[in-house]
Every structure is written in C-alpha cells, then in structure tokens.
Amino acid sequence: MTYWICITNRENWEVIKRHNVWGVPKKHKNTLSRVKPGDKLVIYVRQEKDKEGNLLEPKIVGIYEVTSEPYVDFSRIFKPHRGGKETYPYRVKIKPIKIGEINFKPLINDLKFIKNKKRWSMHFFGKAMRELPEEDYKLIEKLLL
C-alpha cells in the first residue's frame, strides 16, 4: 500500500466528496498510473483567497481509499485550474475513510516529507499528488477530526 497527498482547491474538494473520485490533468497521468486499489489518499486543500479576498489557510480535509485502477473519463466534473480547459480525465474511484479538518501549517515541523520547513509550499508546487511516508500518514490520520 502506498500513501499519497493529493493537492486540490476548495471547489474541487466539493467535487471529490460528491462523486468519490480523484482526478488529475494529463501532465500528471504517469503519477496517477502508480496508484493502486487499497492505496490511501490524503486530501490537501491549498491556501487560496475567497471571493472577498480573505486568505483561506491550507488544510487537510480527508482520507480516502482507492477502490479502482486508474481510468480515463473526460466528463466535466472538476473545475479547471485558472480557467483552463483541462477536465482532470485521469481518475481513480475512491471511498471516504475519514473526513475532517486539520490546519496544515502547524503540522509542517512534524512532517518528514517536508525537508525545507521555511519554503514548505515548494513541496507541492507543480504537483497534483506525491507520495507520503507512512509515518506522516499515521500522524495525519491520528489528528484528523
């Protein structure tokens, strides 16, 4: 079993919950091809601003288990990044294990996969998902309310 942290925005987090599916754009299909049924996905909602310009802090919002092999589906359920046309067609079906919220920034010092604690956001830059050490997964699973 492999543990993954999956990077999304708040709007697509709602899609994930509603459809029980994780999707990535074409440029990340090779990463998704390594995902197998039984793997665990930790959903990370990135820092962003709301419509009023208020800063919304990054959070861990749930843990899911993968229930399918990767597949392709071009139906438009996800909102494209920055107004693009990408449909996040490379997908896996998932089921919820634990849903809740953890503020991410207080975890940074305890997460092993984040080597540069000052520039922690660079560990997510340009990625849709990345492997997560089991130790980090267990910490998140324990703290998720």
Curated annotation (Swiss-Prot):
Q: Which domain of life is it from?
A: Archaea
What InterPro entries does UniProt report for this protein, alphabetically?
Answer: EVE_domain, PUA-like_sf, UPF0310
Q: Tell me the protein's name.
A: UPF0310 protein PH1033
* Taxonomic path: Archaea, Methanobacteriati, Methanobacteriota, Thermococci, Thermococcales
Q: Which Pfam families match?
A: EVE (PF01878)
Q: State the similarity comment.
A: Belongs to the UPF0310 family.
